[in-house]
């Protein structure tokens, strides 16, 4: 592995151990801010802390040259910038680390910095800031989690999601900052990859200027809507969103625990596929920058760009970004868990990168939504007659059982069980004749083609939920478990929201 590959795999995540002591004199004569020959670097996107644990935290910022634009990418030829991290137990920094931590901002990561600080005390409030020559960031604060075995009386947190730049709800962030919170949870859609789309019809706040994507890519069949395609596009969106002072203030005051949903990549996405066109067009022959292809075609480069930008701009205590395999779109693993004493256990999942395709194919005509001009992309993915939804789901689960059966050697004990299940399903497709044990196997194996978590993550999630001894178990879940049903006068059938999965929901409830 050469140096460049090592840097890619390392993903610029650095780590240090906090050692507090005498920080030295704080004379104004020695303050680099007062030395005129030094550059006054800027930190236009503020500061962030993330994933508080009893002894560690992830700290983030982005630094730019005094003459650089706040949002444009740092030129790739730009030299590295040395940044000093200062951490204290007081807001005045009278009790700071004995020696500030030296970090490096690199142009290849758009001068973002992501640092894990360890050796901290549990249930303790800390303050931090960054310096680059004569430039100083705003002061941020965070509170570490209680010790794992601590008896915790209360935990104060807020959760948020779906912060579309074009919708006038950002004033709520100002109110949130006034609360005494331990941390904030973000359940995804931190950015929206589209701008000017049909669902973004609300009046834009006066504080928000127009979004203009660097690549100027347009959504298929909608020349007015811009979409993010390149790494530069996705980086632009994070920087644009974080230019809002209210969001910066929230991040500076509280640590963040974040996952993504679909819009960090593409609306209603699954794995590396978008669903803008319901499978009706294919633009893969066009060169980039372009409007993406239909959901029947993999968009690995675009998915990798979205992953990279999220990793660079959304601090989280996760494994390093791994881009060494050029054809791999699963370059980052964001699902993880955090515990807050004996009181609460947060299990955060990723329901986009590993999920199977939607149960009902996007290109299928949906009898429940005949007027596509009115309902647009709602189509087959959202409002589906319940019996149709169930039949298609059952068919996919049976196909998964058959695939598992055929892959097992004759000597495997599970092959007999799967064979028995398949035999019964030939005459009873509903599975009503299955025993309780056979139904459990059917549910577990059959989820392979309909799961939103994927097998590995689903088993991890199940183990966390079953073994957790916390009083409260919180699932950081970006997709609602509630079923949405409508009794349409034009149709006698009850329709269900296609995102739900009754089999999976029943299993989930048994773990909680």
Where are these regions (language model features)?
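Metal-dependent phosphoester/phosphodiester hydrolase catalytic core
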Residues: 3, 10, 18-19, 29-512
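C-terminal motif of bacterial Sec signal peptides marking the signal peptidase cleavage site
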Residues: 23-24
